[in-house]
Amino acid sequence: MAEKPKKSQKLRARLPRGLADRGPAELAATRAMVETIRAVYERYGFEPVETPAFEFTDALGKFLPDQDRPNEGVFSFQDDDEQWISLRYDLTAPLARYVAENFDSLPKPYRSYRNGYVYRNEKPGPGRFRQFMQFDADTVGSASPAADAEMCMMAADAMEALGIPRGSYVVKVNNRKVLDGVMESIGLGGEENAGRRLTVLRAIDKLDRLGIEGVKLLLGEGRWDGGEQGKGDFTIGAQLSPETSTPILNYLDLGIRVARDRVESPNRELGIVGYLEQIVSGSETGAQGTTELAQIVRLVEAAGYDDGRIRIDPSVVRGLEYYTGPVYEVELLLDTKDEKGRPVRFGSVGGGGRYDGLVSRFRGEPVPATGFSIGVSRLQAALTLLGKLDTRPQAGPVVVTVFDRDRVADYQKMVARLRAENIRAELYLGNPKNMGNQLKYADKRNSPCVIIQGSDEKNDPDGAQIIVKDLVLGAELASLEKDREEYLQKQAEAQRKVPEADLVDEVRRILAKHSVRWS
């Protein structure tokens, strides 16, 4: 007996972990955020540039989020000429390549901004995605501390433009040279210790999340993600002895206390700088760092930014090794609860710093640079939970229904009239047999109104008429069951017959009545 043919199995529709689909309301909120940030950046004189999502892996260089293998930490593949190509993991390394490639034609200093998605080949988790959006601004070709101070001021202005009031955010500033001075003192200076130094920096970068004890484990043998032996994944530490790690832990612990408590000084920020000078005394690199911090403090204060907006915080290090001087982070100070009622502290939503060696790799000459990046995806999640973003579904288009199959051309003409007046409109393209289904479709599209014209309206003795149904008002009728008089009045308003010639005016009246604006 012949075997029965096997049924073809349906392909399961699913997404890889760490990725998410996004609908119209979320995309509209992203667009509004991006335009707000763009306006701030352009007010500071920055101009747009766009680089591709892919770069040669060697252009990203040794500064990949993870080390050793080209596809560790980033998504990579080999091209047909066997060269490794990677998806960008940030927007800074591609900018460095772009500037180096177009160096002679660009004005210096070169001030640019760009936004787009970046990609991380990392273990996904709550709030950790493999694709997310960033919005960067960078100044290439200036070694002046004024360029760093400007990044901090622009970050503060961007937060306030997005509706985050003063006191609800802070721009925290430090200098990697200060920490480099500490690491020099424990024998971790020089190129030969670059790998261990990067591990130390990544450990310190987790201070907000893991606390001093968690960082202590990562400076030593390592840490189990579950918090106990054998629980979760194991992260290998920097393998520092307790004696070697003590100066770093003291720096962090004392630095946090100084940053938290009011310093006995007329100027709190310069008081912290003075404290850091004592920690790195004897280190030329550390002394350079404290001098640059003092210059930034004076510049931002002169521009009117007090320590409630921009302040020194010795715990800020940033995780990537390409930073060479001042580093900064924007932290939200607001607490809220997630959809399950659990407390949420958002922490850092942006950061950056000076990276004087990144462009120089391509040029063989010093090219100073500094930049700042806003994590748009992370910040949007925070603003949504805080109720700072309008996440309601956007108004859909006006829907022109099809009452008579043989008059589709007439209905298309109505759609064209509306579009010519800059009104979003569409012709119903499904099966026109059931008018009820057409109205349900318009409801699902969140349409403000629908247009109906049957043969009776078309051949009206007083001239061609149309029926305009106000769907917003119609939805309100359900709550008016007890007030019959108001119900009947609104019912009459929700469906009006008007001359076809008044199509545009009637639709505009309804849009204005319900404050419908398409962004």
UniProtKB/Swiss-Prot annotation:
It comes from Rhodopseudomonas palustris (strain BisB18). Homodimer. One of its GO terms (molecular function) is ATP binding. One of its GO terms (biological process) is histidyl-tRNA aminoacylation. It catalyses: tRNA(His) + L-histidine + ATP = L-histidyl-tRNA(His) + AMP + diphosphate + H(+). Belongs to the class-II aminoacyl-tRNA synthetase family. It is an enzyme of class 6 (ligase). Keywords: Aminoacyl-tRNA synthetase, ATP-binding, Cytoplasm, Ligase, Nucleotide-binding, Protein biosynthesis. It comes from the Bacteria. This is Histidine--tRNA ligase.
